[in-house]
Amino acid sequence: ASTGWLHTGDPALLLHTDKLFAALREKLDSGWFNELLRELFAPAPVQVIQVPTLPKKDDENAAPARTDGKLVLDHPLTVTDLGEGSPSAEGVVGTVAGAELLHHPSKGSLYLNLYYDLGGLSEEEVQYLDILTDMLDELDTPRHTARELNTLRSTWLGDSTACIAFWTGRQEGTPCHAKLVLSMSLLERSLEKAIELGGEFLYETKLTGEKAEAAFARVLSQQKLNMEQQFIQMGNQYAMVRAMSHYAVEYALSEACSGVTGYKFLCGLLEQADWAALGKKLEAVREKVLHHAALTISLHGSEAAKQKLEALLPGSVFAEEARGTAKAYTQELT
């Protein structure tokens, strides 16, 4: 895309091939390519002369180019060298601040994942929520600009992302599970910062105002360009997902968010360009999910980290007195 931008001023020129191929067909009919070949090669004809020569004889004293043999190790490695290993500690399930807490005892870095259930959402609401996750990095909060908050997240957290995840479960009936996921990796001493910054990032980003509306237009335009480029590069994969969307809920949701259907949804928002209405819709969906949907918190860390998390959550934005119950995401297949 950058090449088209540099030479023509249009970043999407090379992504739309209809005009390009139409121009090439026109030149093909007019004999333009034949004339080009004539101009390039007719003035200086090329002649290739083959001179047969006998191959050189190998030097009898030279070392052979290849030595046949088999590598023999003094102590070949086997499965027994791995040992039995340490068995993984069993996870512990509990509840805190209206959320289900899963603790997986481990040492080293701490991994904190929050899963908001999306089983009660419609397809359109999931589409809006998916767009929201693409916007969060570009939005200010009452306390920080987007750049300041991103810098703080990079400083205190090894990684922190928000996204939509969905998969087909192994339970009876193979239900589709859909979640809004906030993932953070960090050092144990930064757990308090993770709760603070993760909450600000997910709950407090401003979805109204001039800056937010400018971010909506900017991010959606870039998303549209990215999807068009991916259609060209991986069109077969998008076609496969679109075909599977008629048979499995997981693929239907994938198609709605990041497939051709999702692309058309995104194009519709760009054509309407009603950013104030989009901000209100995103606020409504965020309110429904963050404050009412079932929340499961997964912690990979020490017992001390678990105790600290249980102390931090009740006073955080993640705490709710009552939440709904998790359920499978359903969608009528066409």
Predicted segments with their positions:
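Proteolytic maturation boundary segments
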Residues: T3-Q127, K264-T334
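M16 family metallopeptidases and their MPP-like homologs
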Residues: A1-R25, P45-P55, L102, K107-Q272, ...
